[in-house]
Every structure is written in structure tokens, then in C-alpha cells.
């Protein structure tokens, strides 16, 4: 996001996300950028360069700390809001889990090291595993 939006000024907004479900063994890592049509190719190049940089250099401790903080704060919020707590409890019943599973998960997340995260990212997210989709008004290209 920082590279495409602030540094290169190519995108109105860019994000990446990881979705890991509990009901199946699949996960999704995705990224997107909103940009002017004339910037599409440069945004793709920037995305690939940034992904290759992470694969080569790895995530930093600060990036891991920020991501971990966000996940753990969201988990606390899930327990503080009635609707979210009900969803968590209901899912735990379906998954035959207790809230102790959630605590153990959060403890495991707390103990992750940058080296572990980088090893897993390199194993599962090489550039050749990505599908790149471009959408928009092609008449403006």
C-alpha cells in the first residue's frame, strides 16, 4: 500500500488481506489497488516488485508486531460485542472447540517469530502462485 499509494503515487488505495477459515483447509491471500487506467501496468509491476522484496528480504519485526496487534485487538472486540461473541460461540460449538482453543490460538500468535512468518510466507506465497486480474473500462487504456 505504502509503495503504490504514497511512494509511487500510482494508486488511490491499495490493500492486502489474508483470510483463514475454520471450516475448511483453504486460505486466501489477496491484494488489490484502485488506480487510473493508465497506471495499471505500473501498479502490476510495483505489486510484483514489493512481493518479491518481501519474499527476498522478509517482513520486519515492526510489520509482524503491527499485524499481530490488529488480529489480537479484533479478537478482543469479537468478545466485547454480543453479536460477534454469539457467532464465535456458535462456531466453536460447530467446530467442537471451547474458548480455551481461542486462548491457545492467541498465545500461539503471540509467540510467532519473524523467521517463522517469513518461512511460511516464502513457502506458500511465491509469485507464481498468484493470479493477477485487472478490471475496469478498457476503452480508457
Can you annotate each of these PLM segments?
Residues 19, 121-124:
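Short proline/glycine-enriched turn/loop segments at secondary-structure junctions
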Amino acid at each position: 500500500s505504502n509503495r503504490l499509494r504514497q511512494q509511487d503515487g500510482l494508486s488511490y488505495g491499495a490493500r492486502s488481506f489474508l483470510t483463514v477459515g475454520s471450516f475448511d483447509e483453504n486460505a486466501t491471500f489477496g491484494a488489490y489497488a484502485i488506480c487510473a487506467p493508465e497506471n495499471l501496468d505500473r501498479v502490476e509491476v510495483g505489486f510484483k516488485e514489493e512481493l518479491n522484496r518481501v519474499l527476498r528480504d522478509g517482513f520486519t519485526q515492526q510489520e509482524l508486531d503491527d499485524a499481530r496487534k490488529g488480529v489480537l485487538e479484533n479478537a478482543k472486540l469479537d468478545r466485547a460485542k454480543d453479536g460477534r461473541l454469539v457467532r464465535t460461540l456458535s462456531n466453536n460449538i460447530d467446530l467442537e472447540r471451547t474458548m480455551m482453543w481461542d486462548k491457545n490460538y492467541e498465545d500461539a500468535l503471540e509467540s510467532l517469530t519473524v523467521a517463522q512468518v517469513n518461512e511460511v510466507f516464502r513457502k506458500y506465497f511465491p509469485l507464481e502462485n498468484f493470479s493477477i486480474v485487472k478490471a475496469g473500462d478498457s476503452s480508457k487504456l
